[in-house]
Amino acid sequence: MEPAAEILVDSPDVIFGPEAIEARYEYRTTRVSREGGVLRVRPTATRFTFRTARQVPRLGVMLVGWGGNNGSTLTAAVLANRLRLTWPTRTGRKEANYYGSLTQAGTVNLGLDGDGREVFVPFSALLPMVAPNDLVFDGWDISSLNLAEAMRRAQVLDCGLQEQLWPHMESLRPRPSVYIPEFIAANQTARADNLIPGTRAQQLEQIRKDIRDFRSSAGLDKVIVLWTANTERFCEVVPGRNDTAENLLRTIQLGLEVSPSTLFAVASILEGCAFLNGSPQNTLVPGALELASQRHVFVGGDDFKSGQTKVKSVLVDFLIGSGLKTMSIVSYNHLGNNDGQNLSAPLQFRSKEVTKSSVVDDMVQSNRVLYAPGEEPDHCVVIKYVPYVGDSKRALDEYTSELMLGGTNTLVLHNTCEDSLLAAPIMLDLVLLTELCQRVSFCTDSDPEPQGFHPVLSVLSFLFKAPLVPPGSPVVNALFRQRSCIENIFRACVGLPPQNHMLLEHKMERPFPGIKPEEVKATSPLPCKKESTPATNGCTGDANGHTQAPTPELSTA
């Protein structure tokens, strides 16, 4: 990957200092009030000062479920990129990359050059960010297989790549993890041979000790903990048990019901480490959220948004945004990896069903022209376990929408999702964006005391199926709104205005100041980039499958 050009914002409101980037930024929005039958809209402006520390830390990542498909694939991806590996496949040689990562393969628009052309740079060039090749990995798993054996068991990567990675992954072995059988499917028992013994309080203390040991032995500045283990059943929120931080900590000490993922979340928060939940269960119960708020530690979740649901968050936004009334969404999946096997149990499937079904809620609620209060599309989600297909998940979707004058439109999609190869770059983005957010602080003219983002890090919503947000905040699932949120907040950190896509410079009758006008040319269809090539059946490439007929001669009589 080519290094990005250095970005320097030429503005009196921005200072690129040796320790931090400081930017004065005017946040413009609107406030709406209802007065009788009138909606009164009032534009507002708030002056912010953003400060982003430039020193990039040595960052460690601890994966819960390190030996699973996602954990072994992410570790392999970072090693393959660090070692610049290439390997043969039946379609030619491949080389390591970070495709699928917003931060490493996405771009942002800086603005227009003197000729009116848009200038794009890598997302990672906007602000100082940890290089993924510098990440240090550790983690836990209920299975004792080393990472090389776990990679082979996952059957995700080509054999040629596995062979090159084997000596680098063979020495990586997960630490023992927490296993509470009633929270995951019974079919996972065969893998559970690497367990932390003792009471819940003793298990919590061991997790904390593991985090401290990793930070110390690897010489790390920061550690982020990411849950990528099995989907658990939902944990009931019970007053007096897990509704407050105090009650949750007492519940752990008394050995009452608490899920393994919540144990890891609490341990991470107590150690000052951000915790991210990549599975659909309600790991971050109210007590865990309150603890994170008390300790000023970031938490995020829930459930990686990687394949079918990501498409759904785009397609339903398109349909409703186009004025079509989507009435039925039916989503069917089958997969054969361990995630699919675990989800074959009803309670674990229910956790997944909830996150996959809620992804269209905000889009429906945004359009009261189409949907009356309380009205929503029929939405059905089915997941089946088919061992033969392995990590190559099949997703089939049917969207039925009402058109004008009683018409209907049906879209049917088939999506083959390489489950772990889609999830791994999302895990990478979660870690890198969370760490970057830890270095951002801001204040306003009316509140000059510096503060950070809310502990519930909703800026990560782009990467989660069921994004957690601070109490009272709107939940946004529409994918491009989520991406714009990340991009525009980071633009604000360097004093750039939000990306509004207006391009008024190109919509004016007279030339825009500072943009060189071009000669007006007649509009015509774009030329075909490929020339017609004769086929073996005598047809040419642009003849729509038919033999090219000779041009008829017109009579002049």
Curated annotation (Swiss-Prot):
Sequence ranges of Polar residues compositional bias: 533-557
Keywords: Cytoplasm, Inositol biosynthesis, Isomerase, Lipid biosynthesis, Lipid metabolism, NAD, Phospholipid biosynthesis, Phospholipid metabolism, Phosphoprotein
Protein's pathway: Polyol metabolism; myo-inositol biosynthesis; myo-inositol from D-glucose 6-phosphate: step 1/2
Cofactor(s) needed by this chain: NAD(+)
PTM notes: Phosphorylation at Ser-524 does not appear to affect enzyme activity, and is detected in brain and testis.
Record InterPro entries: Myo-inos-1-P_Synthase (IPR002587), Myo-inos-1-P_Synthase_GAPDH (IPR013021), NAD(P)-bd_dom_sf (IPR036291)
Pfam families per UniProt: Inos-1-P_synth (PF01658), NAD_binding_5 (PF07994)
Subunit structure: Homotrimer.
Protein name listed in UniProt: Inositol-3-phosphate synthase 1
Organism: Rattus norvegicus (Rat)
Gene name per UniProt: Isyna1
